[in-house]
Amino acid sequence: VSPMEIKILDADGVEQPFGSKGEICIKGENVMAGYWKNPKSTADTIVDGWLHTGDMGYMRDEEMLYVVGRFKSLLIAADGEKYSPEGIEENLVESSKYIDGAILHNSQDPYTIALITPNKDALKAYAKGLGLDPASNEAKVKMLELLQDEVNIYRKGGRLEGAFPERWLPAAVCVLPEPWTEQNHFLNSSMKVVRGRVEETYKAHMEYAYTPEGKNIVNDMNLASL
C-alpha cells in the first residue's frame, strides 16, 4: 500500500493490530486535502491529516488491506453485534427477477428488516400466469407471498440455506411503491442507493414493520405499494 499510510481505528480512535476490524484511515500525498468550500465536512473527515474513509476493514499484514463494508450501512443488533449487509442485499437482487433493489436495516432493533423495490412488471406477469387480474387484491396477496418466498430461500430449509447468518436475514419486508432512480434522488451519481434518504422517506413503513401486523409481508402498506 506504499506510498500511502493506512491505519485501522476502533470506535474510540485506538489503532488496531493486524486482523482486527475498524475504520480505515489513510494518509499520503495522493489523499485529498479537503472538501471544496466545505470546512465542516473537511473537519469531520480529515483529522490530524488522516482521512477517515467511513469504510470498515482490517489489515492482514503490512501489505494487504481488506475492505468489508461501510459503517453507515452496518446492521447493529440489540446486543451490539455488527454485520455488513451488502452481501445479503446484493444476493436478494441478483437471485430474484422479482426484486430490483434491497437494503437492510437494524439499528439495535428486535430484528432486521428489508426495504425492497419490486419488479412490478415481473410480478404482474406472475399474477397473470395464475389467471388473476394483477390489480385485484387476491393477485397482490400472491405477489407478496412470492416476494417472501424469494427471501426465504436463504432461511433454514431453503435452497440457499447457510449462505448468510440466520440472525441477520430480514424478519420483515417493506415493499416500497417506487423504484430508486437518480431522478427521485434515491440513487446518487455513482448509482449507489442513498440509504439515508430511503430510510427517511419510508420511516413510517419501517416503524410499521416492527409491529405484529407489519411483520407479516401481507399487510396494508405493502398491498398499497403494489
Residue ranges and their predicted role:
Residues P3-E5, D48, T53-G54, D100, ...:
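Short loop/turn microsegments at loop-to-beta-strand junctions
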Residues G28, A33-G34, M56-W168, P179, ...:
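AMP-binding/adenylate-forming catalytic core of the ANL superfamily
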Residues P17, V67, S84, V194-R195:
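A sequence-level detector of short linear motifs
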Residues G101-H105, P110, I153-L226:
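Conserved C-terminal "lid"/linker of ANL adenylate-forming enzymes
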